[in-house]
Amino acid sequence: MASAPTFDNNEFSTAPGDSIRNRVLTDPLETGSVVKLYTAAILIDQGIVTPNTMVDCENGYAVVNGRRLHDSPGHYLGMAPFREVLRWSSNIGIVKVAQELDNDKWYEYLQAFGLGRPTGVDLPGEGSGILYPVGRWTRLSRTSLPMGYELSLT
């Protein structure tokens, strides 16, 4: 586990307070595309997609729920099987398919994965991350969450 800024263990008493905090445990981070794997697992478990389900990724640009989305240059997909949506980390593909999820069920799955609470690792200062309850979700949450935004992990 690594954290920055660092300090010299031999000079601990002179280390600035901020440098001795273990940011990996304490600081919530929006992990972005890592959460696409959680979203994919939920979609597959719910029977919404299979690895071979074709998804229209609209050649890299789309508007979903009033939000303009784009994929990384060089990773633009048209019609593609869901497994390629994951392989190329398509924002558009994952967001479009995730629109089929029920909010309450989605939240239950994210909680079951342990998001929004400490892992219980035996290290001091572990934060819980952030997973807002469904009542705080907005129309844009349905486009942010599948891509790993509006939630954070420690």
Regions found by a protein language model. Give the residues of each.
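Beta-lactam-recognizing serine transpeptidase/beta-lactamase-like catalytic domain environment
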Residues: 1-33, 38-154
